[in-house]
């Protein structure tokens, strides 16, 4: 278990920002975050983050993932000084951080995001992960056994492209296949 004080972070704002689509919400301010072949249980209590990882895992993976090296206090302060509109935006989104996610997953979710909404994008990401990704089961304290699917590699998507119709991607299927072919 790793605990850290972090100002200017709000897990609920990040979850609803349209920046992440694979987080599993357990309840307000408590999530499971799949990342590669592992998952992190994280809970926020005001400015305190309680994470199911070791100190070493935090600094190897999650420090960068949550952009802990950036001074969000200064960014927020600078944005507030621009004008009244930016002040309102800075107040409303003061807990959002730029997450350092897997690049391939970000490219695919960006392609999925055309002409749709956040719940639909989440459903498509989950469906692609279930059809083409690797299933993981993990026991987590207070959560029990949780099943999640690793976001697939471009090779895994191409190997399973005949199964993508189950994902209900529509015209996005050809875009995803084309992107995977370009990457491989």
PLM feature spans:
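HhH-family (HhH-GPD) DNA N-glycosylase catalytic core used in base-excision repair
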Residues: 1-184
